[in-house]
Design a protein with these regions (language model features):
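Secondary-structure boundary motif
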Residues: 16-19, 34
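Short, well-structured alpha-helical segments
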Residues: 22, 26-30
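Flexible domain-boundary/linker segments
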Residues: 27, 42, 46-49, 63, ...
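A short, surface-exposed loop/turn module that caps and links secondary-structure elements
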Residues: 31-56
């Protein structure tokens, strides 16, 4: 089981998501906790690789950006639409 910590930024952005997306995100969060590399999450390391940032899909449009704190703990940094999230 993966432990998840969140930043204030993540919590703020999560609260701003449309209700239907928040519901999907909650389900994906649980799935991530059970298996962070489940195929439906499309977990990937972002470029540049040295930043150590990763993402997974909430749905086709929305993503969660995170960083590994250690082998069993992830820090969710932010979330939002694909078009916006990759500009950070």
């Amino acid at each position: 089981m993966i432990a998840v910590e969140t930043t204030f930024e993540f919590e703020r952005r999560f609260a701003e998501l449309p209700a239907a997306v928040r519901k999907q995100a909650h389900k994906k969060w649980i799935l991530f906790s059970e298996n962070p590399y489940h195929p439906s999450l499309h977990t990937e390391k972002l470029h540049p690789k040295q930043r150590e940032l990763w993402s997974f899909r909430i749905n086709r449009q929305y993503r969660i950006i995170f960083r590994w704190l250690d082998a069993s703990t992830a820090l969710f940094l932010t979330c939002g639409p694909h078009s916006w999230i990759y500009r950070i």
